[in-house]
Amino acid sequence: MPPKSRSTGPKKTQKTRRRDKKNIPHGAAHIKSTFNNTIVSITDPAGNVISWASSGHVGFKGSRKSTPFAAQLAAESAARKAQEHGVKKVDVFVKGPGSGRETAIRSLQAAGLEVGTISDVTPQPHNGCRPPKRRRV
């Protein structure tokens, strides 16, 4: 019995799903600023992420990710993407002890988003995990 020939017809191309533009005038900006990185997520009122950016995503590597300038560029990038979806006003929620907290908030304002309330939602342990040992330099 001869082997079955494979069809060499047209290849099926897989469609990539394009994100449709939503019109969300009011959102929330979540800024997570750690000692190593800064992540900015802009969400709709239900908490679904519209746009995000981080210091590493913007193009910084290593210890430069933790700088305030990297946080500024990350916030500008996230704000630009969010404005394409119609976001004009945001409430800011800041989490973490990093150096890019204030810079990220200022650059959201500079990018054209109106900042409503600013809340610090850094989690505080009620004597939970033991913290890492002190650095000796």
UniProtKB/Swiss-Prot annotation:
This is Small ribosomal subunit protein uS11. Keywords: Ribonucleoprotein, Ribosomal protein, RNA-binding, rRNA-binding. It holds the Pfam family Ribosomal_S11. GO terms for molecular function: rRNA binding; structural constituent of ribosome. It comes from Rhodococcus erythropolis (strain PR4 / NBRC 100887). GO terms for cellular component: ribonucleoprotein complex; ribosome. PANTHER family: 40S RIBOSOMAL PROTEIN S14/30S RIBOSOMAL PROTEIN S11 (PTHR11759). Located on the platform of the 30S subunit, it bridges several disparate RNA helices of the 16S rRNA. Forms part of the Shine-Dalgarno cleft in the 70S ribosome. Residues 1-27, 116-137 are annotated as: Disordered. Residues 12-21 have a biased composition (Basic residues). Belongs to the universal ribosomal protein uS11 family. It comes from the Bacteria. Part of the 30S ribosomal subunit. Interacts with proteins S7 and S18. Binds to IF-3. The keyword RNA-binding applies. Transmembrane segments: none annotated. One of its GO terms (biological process) is translation. Disulfide bonds: none annotated. Residues 1-10 have a biased composition (Polar residues).
